[in-house]
């Protein structure tokens, strides 16, 4: 059965309990004052005792061990068992239980225990005592290598841990100009010479190289001037006569219409051509 939250809080539950008691009293009595009825019953009958278990007379009462006497030389404390409150019940049992725990609640530490405690406080290595910190949460731990590192990794760690300065890098005062051998080595490292591939299999013959005979594909090839046919010039002549324009010397040029008015075009907004 699944748990459901209560429908009422503490005040609501007390109100429901009070109403149920009133209704149960009104079911068998018509006095109308169940509080006074309960008070009269309490004066006449007294405090009700807890119910006895069925199946015969109750067993013998359990006897509680008395408290141990206080140690010699220690100040005597006030014990609650000496002046027990009236009524007994659970309070008496709790007092006797506290007093019966070996006298720990009523006695002080023995001199030997005090000396051991002072010796432990004065010990220099008491901070090395292992402490139980409880279960450790799940978190990432950085793994550290305690052995010797390679020179390359050592340089990386040195550069990572070094603080960077905002000032520009300065050359050392003792730094001399690079020699000719150093400049040659630097140039050789910057411009490596292309080394052709070497055939690793000495038994096989070398692979011959053949010249390329396929045409070269260029992005902007050099085109030869197009040769126009007689039919192309006849079509150009007919088009010039129909649209009343001069013929073009090169058919790839845009045509020109002299009778068309000229317009000034601008991409600016609000431009008024004059």
Curated annotation (Swiss-Prot):
One of the Pfam families matching this protein, by short name: TT_ORF2-like
Stretches for region Disordered: 44-190
Coiled-coil zones: none
Composition bias type Basic residues, residue spans: 129-143
Low complexity: bias regions: 174-187
Biased composition (Basic and acidic residues): 157-173
Ranges of biased composition (kind: Pro residues): 48-60
Superkingdom as given in the UniProt entry: Viruses
InterPro entries named in the record: HEV_TT_vir_Orf2/Gyrovir_Vp2_N (IPR004118)
Name this polypeptide is given: Uncharacterized ORF2/4 protein
């Amino acid at each position: 059965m699944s748990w459901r939250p209560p429908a009422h809080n503490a005040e609501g539950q007390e109100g429901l309990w009070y109403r149920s008691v009133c209704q149960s009293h009104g079911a068998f009595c018509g006095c109308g004052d169940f509080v006074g009825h309960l008070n009269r019953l309490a004066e006449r009958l007294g405090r009700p005792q807890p119910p006895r278990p069925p199946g015969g007379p109750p067993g013998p009462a359990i006897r509680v061990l008395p408290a141990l006497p206080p140690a010699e030389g220690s100040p005597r404390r006030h014990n609650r068992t000496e002046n027990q409150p009236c009524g007994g019940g659970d309070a008496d049992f709790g007092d006797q239980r506290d007093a019966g725990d070996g006298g720990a609640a009523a006695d002080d530490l023995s001199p030997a225990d005090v000396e051991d405690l002072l010796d432990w406080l004065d010990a220099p290595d008491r901070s090395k005592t292992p402490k139980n910190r409880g279960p450790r949460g799940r978190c990432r731990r950085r793994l550290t290598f305690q052995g010797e590192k390679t020179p390359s990794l050592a340089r990386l760690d040195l550069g990572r841990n070094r603080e960077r300065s905002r000032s520009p890098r300065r050359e050392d005062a003792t730094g001399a100009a690079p020699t000719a051998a150093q400049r040659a080595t630097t140039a050789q490292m910057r411009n490596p010479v292309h080394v052709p591939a070497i055939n690793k299999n000495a038994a096989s013959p070398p692979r011959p190289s053949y010249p390329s005979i396929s045409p070269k594909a260029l992005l902007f090839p050099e085109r030869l001037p197009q040769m126009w046919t007689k039919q192309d010039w006849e079509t150009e002549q007919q088009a010039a006569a129909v649209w009343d324009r001069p013929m073009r010397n090169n058919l790839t040029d845009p045509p020109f219409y002299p009778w068309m008015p000229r317009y000034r075009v601008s991409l600016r907004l609000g431009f008024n051509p004059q």
